Amino acid sequence: MSGIRVRFAPSPTGDLHIGGVRTALFNWLFAKNKGGKFILRIEDTDETRSTGESAKVILDAMKWLELEWNEGPGNENLKYSPYSQMKRKERGIYRKYADELVAKELAYPCYCTPEEIDVMRKKAKADKLPPKYDGKCRHLTPGQRKQKEIEGKKAVVRFKMFGSGTTVLNDIIRGRVKFDNSLLDDFVIMKASGVPAYNFACVVDDYLMEITHVLRGDDHISNAPRQMHIYNALGWEMPEFAHMSMILGAGGARLSKRHGHTSVLEYRKEGYLREALINYLALLGWSTEDSQQIFTIEELKQKFSVERCGISPSIFDPAKLLWLNGEKIRSKTPQQVYELFIDWLKYTGNEKLTETWDVELLKKALILEHDKIKLLKDIPSLVDFFFTKNVDYKEEAVKKTLLSEKSKDIAKLVLIESAARLPNQLDFSAISLEQYARNLAAEKNIKTGQVFHPIRVAISGRMQGPGLFQMMEVMGKEDVVRRINVAINKFFQK
C-alpha cells in the first residue's frame, strides 16, 4: 500500500445530488487531513441508465466545488487506470477474477431466468422464509452446464454464500455490525451480458486501486457482508469501512426536491457559493467538540476526522444553508462579491442583464447592499434601480409615501424644495446630504421621516433599500435631481 487512498465512485445515471456530494466531500477532507490521495472513479455499469452526459455533469459539479481528484478522469495514473468501470470491463479485469472464483468453486454459472427467480422468491415469501435465490444451479454437474450452453442459455455468475454463521464488520463510525449469513443468498457477481455486478466490481476496483478506506453512506451497509466475503474468497486484504449517516429532509422524510434542490449545480444556478455548500454539508453527520458552525475550507481540512462522524441521520435544512450562504457572502470584500456575481452571470447566461450597467457604479452599489445579499441571484433586484432611466415606482410605496391624503402635500413640498436646492449642494457626500435633509425638516417644522421617505421613493421607487444618503451619494447629484424632477412631473403636475 502507498499511504491513505480513498475514492468517490458515483454512478452516472443522473445529476450529482446532495448525498453524493457529502460522500465526495468527506472522502476529500479525509484525504487532505491525512495527506492521502483522493480518487474519482465512474461506476457506469448500469447499462440502461448510465450516460456520458451524466458523467459530464458529475465532473462539472466536482470542478465547481473544487473537490479536485488526484487520480481519475482527465488525471489518470497508468498503474490504476482506467477509471471507468465499463472501460475496465473491456480489458477483461472483472472476468479474470470471476473465472478465478469459479475455478475455486467459490462461484458458479446460473442459468435461471428472471421469471424463475421471481417464482422462487414469491414461494419463499409464502413459506415465510427470506425471499432469496434457492441455489438451484449451485449443484449442476459439468455435463448439465454444458447442456444448458448447448441450448443457448445465458448464464450469470453467482457467488457461493455460507448458509449459516455471522459476518462481523468493524466499522470506524458504527463499531461492530453483525450480519446473519442465513439471510444472504448466492448473489450475482457477473451479469449474463458480461458486465460486473456492483458488489463485485467495486471490490475488484478497490483492491486493484489500493483503496485503504471506504467512506460511504449507510445505505451501502447492507452491501458490506457480500463484499467482505468476496475479499476473503480472493484472499485480499480488506480496506477499512466507515458508513456515514443518511441525510433526510424535514420531518425525517427521504430527501427529495420538495426539501430543496437535489442537483448540486442547481444550487450554483441559484447563487450559492461553493464554500457555503461545502461548509453546510460538512455539518451533516460531522461536528467538532466545540460545535463550531462556520469554517473556511482550510479549517475543514485541518479539523475533519471520521471518528467525529455520528450515526444519527442528519436533517437537511435549506434555511440554515441560506443563512450560511449569506454569512459567507458577508465575509467577502465588495470586490470579491463583484467577481463572484460576474462569474454567476456568465454561468447562468445572464450577461445581458448588466451589459449596460456602469461597472464602477455597480461596485459602489454592491458596497451599499453587501449585508443584504443572501444569494448571488438577489443582486439584480437589490441594485437594478441604480441603473434605470425610468424608475419603477412600487404602487404601495407611492400610495403610502407620496399620494396619501396625509402625506401628499408635504411630499410635494419636500420634492419641489429638493429639486430647487440640491443642484446648488456643493458637497454631495452622504454626511452633507443628511445634514441638508435634517435642516429642511427643521425649517419646515416637519419630521425628518417626512423628508427622507419622499426622497427615497422619488429616486428609487421603493420604501426599502440602502441608506438614503449613501444611495444619493453613489447615484450622484445629476441623477438624483433628475429622478426627483421626474417624480414631481409624474405625481404632482396636473
From Swiss-Prot:
Pfam families: Anticodon_2, tRNA-synt_1c. It catalyses: tRNA(Glu) + L-glutamate + ATP = L-glutamyl-tRNA(Glu) + AMP + diphosphate. The lineage of its organism: Bacteria, Pseudomonadati, Elusimicrobiota, Endomicrobiia, Endomicrobiales. This is Glutamate--tRNA ligase. One of its GO terms (cellular component) is cytosol. Keywords: Aminoacyl-tRNA synthetase, ATP-binding, Cytoplasm, Ligase, Metal-binding, Nucleotide-binding, Protein biosynthesis, Zinc. One of its GO terms (biological process) is glutamyl-tRNA aminoacylation. It comes from the Bacteria.
